[in-house]
Every structure is written in structure tokens, then in C-alpha cells.
Amino acid sequence: MHNITFFEVTEPKEAYRSAVNNLLTQLSQNAKPMTIDEMTYMATCNESHLFFLCIDNKIIGMSTLAVYRSPIGCKVWIEDVVVDKDYRGQGLGRALIEKTIKEAKRFAPCSLLLTSRPSRIEANALYQSIGFWKRETNVYKMDII
């Protein structure tokens, strides 16, 4: 039996940055590599919380909680959810999301949100099976350079 662990990154380490960059390439072909400065910021700031899912001390998945307050309340976004391609189909994505939701509850009351491309059929089915519902809205993006 494998030892499965889940933890929040609270200090920058090169091994963590390397794991993030490996997983990012599997999440999006447009992702740029994370720098050690970005890792340091994420590990120490209050609004971003990076989590790793490990099997036998090997990082095989990650998720991020982005937390902010607006006039209508606290919002928590789940971002960058990915399980290493070699470990998919074993229920680890569900475990990762469920553990991330548990962490989000420390910010309650809040709205917990996430986005997922329509082409990610399995991921969308997973999110709905856990209790998320599809919200009819438009999400817009602008790159500010």
C-alpha cells in the first residue's frame, strides 16, 4: 500500500519549484516555468496557497487556492489542479480536490469557485460529481504586460 500525503507549501524549495514546473507542462502547453522568486512569493503570501499531493514522498499532483475579499464576500478560487499523467485514473484527482475543498473551509463563509476548459471532460465530470455546479457566466481574460 502506498503512503498518500497532502500538504501546503510554506517554504520555497528547488525541488518544489521543479515539481510545479513538471506538472505545469502537463496542465497547459502555454504555461511558463515558475521562478524561485515566484515560488518564494507563493510560499509566504496570504492570498495564495499551493498544495501538493504525494505518493511515497513523490509529488504527483498540485492545486492552488487563491483567496480574496470583495464587497459581496470572500471568494476562494481553486486553480492549477493537475495530477501527473502517470498517476491518473486512480482516484487521485478526486482526493486532491476533496483535500483542497477541506482546506478552503478555513476561509468560510466563502464562495468556492473554479474554471475548467470544456475539453477536459473527465475533470468537468469529477467537479460536478463532488458537488460543483456549472455557473452560466462569461469569463474574460486580458494579459497585462
List each model region and its residues:
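Active-site beta-strand termini and strand-to-loop segments that position acidic
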Residues: 54-56, 142-144
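A conserved beta-turn-beta hairpin within the catalytic core of GNAT-like acetyltransferases
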Residues: 68-78, 88, 133-135
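Conserved beta-strand in the GNAT
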Residues: 52, 58-67, 77, 82
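Active-site rim helix/loop that mediates acceptor-substrate recognition in acyltransferases
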Residues: 29-50
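Conserved active-site alpha-helix within GNAT-family acetyltransferase domains
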Residues: 94, 118-136, 141-142
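Conserved N-terminal entry element of GNAT/NAT acetyltransferase domains
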Residues: 1-18
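Conserved acetyl-CoA-binding loop-helix of GNAT-fold acetyltransferases
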Residues: 83, 89-102, 125, 129
